[in-house]
Amino acid sequence: MAVPKRKTSPSRRGMRRSADALKAPTYVEDKDSGELRRPHHIDLKTGMYRGRQVLKVKSAEA
């Protein structure tokens, strides 16, 4: 059975747990449409990604 040789200090334990916290998602304002979107994601309103059209946008009537 695996047993630690030394006691884990509170500082080391805290450093390990510092990555466990939930972080709020980041959003950036799209420079073309002004909508908020996630970084490195497609703008779903326009279908654009990095200045290129990658999705066909459905019309509002459909």
UniProtKB/Swiss-Prot annotation:
What Pfam families would the database entry show? Ribosomal_L32p
* A single GO cellular-component term on record: large ribosomal subunit
Q: Which UniProt keywords apply?
A: Ribonucleoprotein, Ribosomal protein
In this chain, composition skew of type Basic and acidic residues spans 28-44
Compositionally biased tracts (Basic residues): 1-16
Q: Where are the transmembrane segments?
A: none
Family, as annotated: Belongs to the bacterial ribosomal protein bL32 family.
Annotated protein name in UniProt: Large ribosomal subunit protein bL32
Question: Which source organism does the UniProt entry give?
Answer: Methylorubrum extorquens (strain ATCC 14718 / DSM 1338 / JCM 2805 / NCIMB 9133 / AM1)
Organism taxonomic ancestry: Bacteria, Pseudomonadati, Pseudomonadota, Alphaproteobacteria, Hyphomicrobiales
